[in-house]
């Protein structure tokens, strides 16, 4: 099982120390209610070898390697373990010559977001809905002091810990398996990311308020979410599914999204990027047995989802507390 005590020790002398009032009890409770496969997944992490990487690149990729390459047998054993943690959704990872080609080219998103951010050097960062942690490692690569990701999905936690193990057990990033609604308001993070989460929230304004409560005064919010074309009065509420996803509730226009952020008290709200999701960015690979974007679009008109809605388009909004 994954041990969170090193994280408790890390934050004990930081401005996150107040979290220790609630977090250990929450995670003890979490351990009693985990997914039935969690024990198996965490053992897979244990089975991975303790390799020392001579080269780690988190600035331009998430990559580890060493001067003496692994044998083919060693590579195949690691691939076998990692594939037991499928599906791998967000990546890619390059680990000791093994290319973990995930469903999403999350480096594409990072390249869109990064140029607009306040420098991450020395910052304490929260990544809400972090998945398996790809962007967390890229934040570390930009010089973040500490990156905390939260995501309640046990598989993502085990994928994150597997990658960490193959990155010399780097402790600058940590994944906590909780949702933001379970976090006490810490007002302790310099930057808070919420990417690909808002449209899954039944109450989007509550989510925005929860993000604000985690920021220091003047801190920066990085919000990336699905949007639709339209004016300040435009919000899509899918009747049933959107792109085959049943847990999509509100997809606003950029103007509506900016209005929401201002309504909950954010300042300096600005849209810095809008991009339609491409079949190069989200696609099937050998590391994903499920359907992907091509299956979610109208086969005769890729400008629409299979349900007839506008195809996925994502905006990046920055704001300050």
Curated annotation (Swiss-Prot):
Example GO biological process: tRNA wobble uridine modification
**UniProt-annotated binding residues for carboxy-S-adenosyl-L-methionine:** 90, 104, 109, 129, 151-153, 180-181, 195, 199, 314
Sorted alphabetically, which InterPro entries does this protein's record hold? Answer: CmoB, Mo5U34_MeTrfas-like, SAM-dependent_MTases_sf
Q: Which CDD domains does UniProt cross-reference here?
A: AdoMet_MTases (cd02440)
| Keywords noted in UniProt | Transferase, tRNA processing
Catalytic activity annotated for this protein?
carboxy-S-adenosyl-L-methionine + 5-hydroxyuridine(34) in tRNA = 5-carboxymethoxyuridine(34) in tRNA + S-adenosyl-L-homocysteine + H(+)
EC class: transferase
Listed GO MF terms: methyltransferase activity; transferase activity, transferring alkyl or aryl (other than methyl) groups
The EC designation for this entry is 2.5.1.-
Family matches, as PANTHER family: PUTATIVE (AFU_ORTHOLOGUE AFUA_2G14390)-RELATED, TRANS-ACONITATE 2-METHYLTRANSFERASE-RELATED
- Protein family per UniProt: Belongs to the class I-like SAM-binding methyltransferase superfamily. CmoB family.
Q: How does it assemble?
A: Homotetramer.
Record HAMAP family: tRNA_carboxymethyltr_CmoB
> What's this protein's function?
Catalyzes carboxymethyl transfer from carboxy-S-adenosyl-L-methionine (Cx-SAM) to 5-hydroxyuridine (ho5U) to form 5-carboxymethoxyuridine (cmo5U) at position 34 in tRNAs.
Protein name as catalogued: tRNA U34 carboxymethyltransferase
The organism is Haemophilus influenzae (strain ATCC 51907 / DSM 11121 / KW20 / Rd)
Question: What is the gene name?
Answer: cmoB
